[in-house]
Structures are given as structure tokens and as C-alpha cells.
Amino acid sequence: MSLHIATMSSPSQELLLKPTFNPLYAASKPLLTHTTKNHVSLSRTTTTRAILSSTKEVVMKEFRHHRALKIISGLHNFDKENVASVVTAADKGGATHVDIACDPELVKLVVSLTSLPICVSSVDPSAFLAAVEAGATMVEIGNYDSFYDSGRLFSPDEILLLTKETRRFLPNVTLSVTVPHTLSLPEQAKLAELLQEEGADIIQTEGGKCSNPSKAGVLGLLEKATPTLAAAYTISRAVKIPVMCASGLSAVTVPLAITAGAAGVGVGSAVNKLNDVVAMIAQVRSLADALASQKETNVDQEKTVKWL
């Protein structure tokens, strides 16, 4: 399958958008070798369990190493050209995961472009089913910020209900749940604990409108990231599952998120608001390099402690 994007007239950019084989998607279509009805049923069940287990391990691997980098195209972004550019940038720039709107056609497009684990975001649990069938390997209840301008807020009880419903529909798929910044830090920590009990695999933080900086430059970048860094610090000490720090992060503040206790970071507007795929790749690369440098720093510190 090939993809042509009309706005990408540069030969180098068209080459960057070349389809990629996705081994996870190929594995989701098991070969049935038995002929009897019972054997076929057993084969499907066994194969499905094995695939889900191995897929979840792939999705969670970078979180366990505290180096997950998820690039987010946006909950309400159904622009195939923009999503393709963002995903290509994530793939070529060194990200470990991509996060797109929960739409089966978008998922099929992204499956053709990258072998990275694909996360779909929604606040409608029933919408996840078709997306997972299309090739998504991770689902997320979150990206509430797109609703805030209209005054729509999500309560802890509502988020817990959405989590329970999602787990009922998809008991074995990797599940990430965002804790809204509209709650106080103690309330965020409490909700995270309850989400962990309900089977969430990852907790994601957010910064929201309160992260708009009043200063420029590095000071502004630090100010913008403060709410989500504070949430990552607080929540990571309340739960045992990985925490993903998202909202308002940059190459300057990504290392701080890991230091605060996050197992990974999620970045959206710093990438998806750019209008050139090459610029997007450069931005993702700077984020990946910042994460790598933090990992090297942690290793050096561990060696120093052992030497002392």
C-alpha cells in the first residue's frame, strides 16, 4: 500500500512517508492449522492470548526502562495528512509510541506507516473495539483538554466508570488513563491509586491551561511544564504502575519528567503544530536525545553511588 499526500511535493518528504511493515499488525491475524471445530476454537484462543501477551510486552518495554516517548497527534485530529506527517516524524525521529484519534481508518493508515506501538485516545470505551481490530495495540482514556474550552470536565467517578467499561470490553489490551489536572494533587494521587486497582497499566498526567507561561525562553519552558511535573512526582509515589508525564513538555523539561518519577513522556503540540514533516522529525529527535541523555546521566549516577 502506498500513500500520497498532496501537500508534500518534496521528493525527500514523499520518501519519508513510505509505508512500513508492522509486525504487530501481521501477528494479529493468526493462522489456523487445525480443521476440527474444537481445535480451531482452541487454536484461536491460545494464539490470541499469546499475541496479546507478547504485544503488551512490546508496548510496555520502554516504560520499564524509563525511556518511553509517545508523540501525540490529537484526540480530535482526523486530518490524515497531518496525522501521517506526525507519525512519520515519530517513526524517523526516534519515538517509541504514537498516539492518534480513535478512528479505525486512521489506525489502518498509521499501521502502514510505522511499526511503533499505536495508542488510540477516546472518552468512549465502545469506540476502542474497532480501533484495536484495525491494529491499535494500546488504548487511552484521556486528552480531556480538548473539552475544557467548552466547560466540560471529567470527575473521578466518571473516569473510574470509563476505566471499568474499557476493561470490560478489552481485558487484555494495554490501558492508559489520564488523570485530569483540574483535580488537586492529593486528589490526582488518590484517583491514580483507584485506577491502578481497576486495571490501568499506565497513568498519564496533564498540565492544561494553567501551564501557559508568563515568561519567555527557558524560564517559560520550565514554568509551562511545572503542573505536569508536579503531578508526575506526586502520582509516581502513589502507584506502582508506570507514569507518563504529558502536556507542556519540551527538550528542556523532558529530562526533568524522568527525574520526577515518570517512566515516559508524551508530547503533542510541540510536534503536531509544525507544518513541515522535516521540522517535525528534528523536534522528535531533540526530544529523544534529551531522554537518552537523561538515561545516561542516571547510569553514571548509579555507577558513582556504587563506587562510593
Regions found by a protein language model. Name each.
Residues 2-33, 38-46, 51-245, 249-308:
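Alpha/beta enzyme core
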